[in-house]
Regions:
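Class I S-adenosyl-L-methionine-dependent methyltransferase catalytic core
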Residues: 1-61, 66-86, 90-346
Length: 346
């Protein structure tokens, strides 16, 4: 039986596939409209109120405030971002075929748009996927461990608001840097609305710059610094002066981003302040990058920090059923568990 070639080429990138199921123009436009539909402001505010009372669920917040910028980012293993995929009908016809083969995962009573959103999360490998968010439960636990009485927390790669919201609900002052101006604007709006709907005064300081750039006003102020920084080219954001793009050399990235970030964190931390980092080895274009060893080596060779401990980050959303898929398709190496390494300033 001859395998049908339905390879897709768009924006100079190609995705090899035999799958395609035609969509009418009306169906295609309806799918795009549904996937781009956001939660309402009231739904997002309800999430904010629940978060202030201890909840870790924030899907409505992400959907309302962050969806546009989130959809512009793409996994470095994939051909397109969700934003790009939605703009090209053949890509949606590929996903239309994917959702037609398993009615348990993609039930017929749900719309095509809803099922394709699920497919972005479960089976978009090499084509396009939704970028993950850092689990709020984990940052809650870290802040309650290292800042039980409050203090100043520096998040050196802001991400999708989970760490900022955790700091806000735990009564911790939040300092965040990120080069993505659209993200920073969204975080400012989240903070303002959180204060309004919860009646809470938060202490949030946001800087629209990369962590490799020194910010004098933070020097000597920080008690605890933690983030889940870019895993080299595993995720590409393409907004603002990002630390890397598809053409960035790995060793140059270590020299120009990781090393100055570590130096800056040292300057920001108070005496005996804590520096923690979530890192994991990755595979991009069949090349394995040993981020764990390389970044820990840089930290230890700096002579500025003493190793304290590690914490497990259980992230089942990155598990794809086998060691092969975990290593070669998700972009993460062998195990799905990730580690948080903790150091103390010396």
């Amino acid at each position: 039986m001859t395998k049908v070639n339905n390879d897709i080429t768009y924006l100079g990138r190609t995705f090899k596939t035999s799958l395609s199921k035609p969509l009418t123009d009306v169906e295609y436009n309806d799918i795009v409209t549904e996937i781009r539909k956001k939660p309402t402001f009231d739904e997002a505010c309800d999430d904010l109120i629940r978060i202030s009372k201890g909840s870790t669920r924030m899907s409505k917040v992400v959907g309302y405030y962050l969806q546009d910028v989130l959809y512009k980012g793409r996994n470095g293993q994939d051909a397109w971002s969700i934003d790009e995929a939605l703009s090209y009908k053949p890509i949606m016809e590929y996903f239309n075929a994917k959702i037609s083969v398993n009615d348990k995962v993609y039930p017929a009573h749900l719309s095509k748009g809803e099922n394709i959103k699920t497919a972005f999360r479960l089976c978009g490998i090499r084509c396009c996927r939704k970028l993950p968010n850092f689990p709020m439960k984990t940052i809650d636990e870290l802040l309650q461990t290292y800042l039980p009485n409050g203090g100043n927390y520096y998040d050196y790669s802001c991400g999708w608001a989970s760490r900022m919201l955790s700091a806000m609900k735990n009564g911790v002052s939040y300092y965040g840097t990120d080069p993505n101006n659209e993200l920073i604007d969204a975080l400012i709006n989240i903070n303002g609305d959180y204060q309004e709907v919860t009646g809470t005064d938060t202490d949030v300081h946001l800087f629209n710059t990369g962590s490799e750039v020194f910010i004098p006003e933070m020097e000597g102020k920080i008690d605890f610094s933690f983030s889940s920084p870019p895993y080299f080219t595993l995720e590409l954001y393409n907004i603002g002066n990002q630390s890397c793009n598809e053409d960035t050399d790995y060793n140059e990235w270590l020299d120009n981003y990781i090393k100055p970030t570590i130096d800056n964190i040292y300057k920001y931390l108070k005496e005996d302040g804590i520096f923690a980092i979530n890192i994991k080895d990755i595979v991009v274009n069949k090349i394995e990058y040993h981020l764990t060893d390389d970044i820990n080596r840089i930290i230890q060779e700096s002579g500025k920090f003493e190793f304290v401990t590690t914490h497990d980050l259980k992230n089942i959303k990155r598990t794809f059923g086998s060691r092969y898929w975990a290593k070669h398709e998700t972009g993460l190496s062998d195990k799905a568990d990730e580690l948080i390494f903790v150091y103390k300033k010396i």
